[in-house]
């Protein structure tokens, strides 16, 4: 009964915090009432969604190699004979009908949207799989992962909205490439990129209180790790739990390097960059790892002086590694491999994410008082202080006694609270507000 009561209280807190003010007052729509369809905005000429390069982890992912009729991978391409789609097929070989299953699924969904948007008009494909080398090197057309589309009436005034419909249909990258067509592409079948989530690799290291470092995979409730408050002051914060943890999974990580430091994190995870104001001072801005570019300034930590320094990014690369861990601290930040990062992913507003997790932090604090556990530190660890350096701050309601609401031993996978927030986010937020790789999936 107590567990059920706690769950209901948490759910109430979540709804209170994540519901925009416009939905929290006034007549609004009641529970169970029909949702009003959201207004769709046409793409502008040369606009692409998401706003990253096509072959990056945040969009359709890496080029994996040209597929020919003699390739082993050719059998993975499937013909699309949907009668609601017109295929130009100027080569008269049927090549434009061949595509990956993911591309086919998105195209079929788009065909329905087109007929609903413009009765009597069909979706038209001008380019699909390319076996003749008509596109640029490493084009996804060579893998059957890209299509160029128009409407059957070739009314160019419709193409901006056609692009928007393609985004809504689930294409991983949509580009209003030419006034003559819209370009769309998808991730590779069963690609690692499609399941990246928001984490750090198992071997990433954090700095613990009283000196020394620890692999992120070895963190336990009661540990205090180097973190930062909202003003950029370094301090040691309570480790609460893992938002996500998978020991043996292989994932692609962005490797962001400065002249002396290197941090690895998945595409949808947030990193802090320095943003210069008009008066010359710098402020923190949270940015998806997939959007970090050479020349950006990120923050590195000096544990001896307990200060942060803005340092230029020299190189951004991709690397596959084993294990995926997303630690949550009381302050919502963590210094990983001596680089300051957010504990959050999916949405590019660190402050919103930290607020959304407030009910969980409160519930964990309450749980520590109701079910106190032995305060002695685990074997091999030095004792921790009873309070944080900034214990007067609201975010420090938690103490080193904290435990997960479910269990001291957290199961692998994404925490139920994170899954719940993600689901609520998909209901309340525009699809462009969430990173396309923000929540790991079990299928691509």
Curated annotation (Swiss-Prot):
The record marks 266 as: Involved in auto-cleavage. Residues 1-24 form the signal peptide. GO terms for biological process: animal organ development; cell development; cell fate specification; cell-cell signaling; central nervous system development; intein-mediated protein splicing; neuron differentiation; pattern specification process. The record marks 269 as: Essential for auto-cleavage. Sequence repeats lie at residues 386-393, 394-401, 403-409. Its EC number is 3.1.-.-. Induction: By thyroid hormone. This is Sonic hedgehog protein. CDD domains: Hint. It comes from the Eukaryota. The lineage of its organism: Eukaryota, Metazoa, Chordata, Craniata, Vertebrata. Zn(2+) binds at residues 141, 148, 183. Ca(2+) 1 binds at residues 90-91, 96, 126-127. A motif (Cardin-Weintraub) lies at residues 33-39.
